[in-house]
Amino acid sequence: MKKIRIWDLPTRLFHWALALCVLGSFISVNVGGLYMQWHAYFGIAILGLILFRLIWGFVGTHYAKFSQFIKGPKAIKAYLQNPKNEAGHSPIAGLSVVVVLVFFGCQAILGLFTTDEIAFDGPLAKYISNEWVDIFSHLHQFNQFILIGIVVLHVGAIIFYKYIKRINLTQAMLTGDKDSQDMSVDEPISAKDDGNHQIKALVIFLMIASVFYYIFILRLGT
């Protein structure tokens, strides 16, 4: 049994950091009160993580690039007719990545303009009219149910792969490696998860973190 590096370290760190921030934002908004400030921090962190993933989707390693897993309708139809165990994301999984980035990204952006009408306002709410704040707040509240559905489907897919297809996706996202026997391709490409790529990812992350800190903490006082 041969192990193949599929998911690079930056992609794995993004995945688990996003999961923790989503969990943190869900808990903090339900507790409410003073924890709404933490809800804002988690939301800003989610926005930064998604921005990082968008950039990494163009400059990252082989399986992290959007060009590797974002496919058109024909490829998706062909996959549904003849499913294969891809080394990286399948066309359906690639579509789910797009859905996650779009809906969680929109939720984070909407949160910047919302209010709970009690003690918390998003950092950008003061720059728009009350009418638009109400619209964004309602959209933010409605979208949370879509996000819950996305999370449920994601967890369901992981369980399906683990117990039905006998493929441990969670372990692969922890270690970065997949068993060659779990892939349909004969000679899968190994991701170049080396120091150069990791330094590049760190530079991108620090640049985003610095810009966000300046805008949201120093300028807006979030």
Label each residue range with its predicted role.
Residues M1-T222:
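Membrane-embedded alpha-helical bundles that constitute the cytochrome b-like, heme-associated redox core
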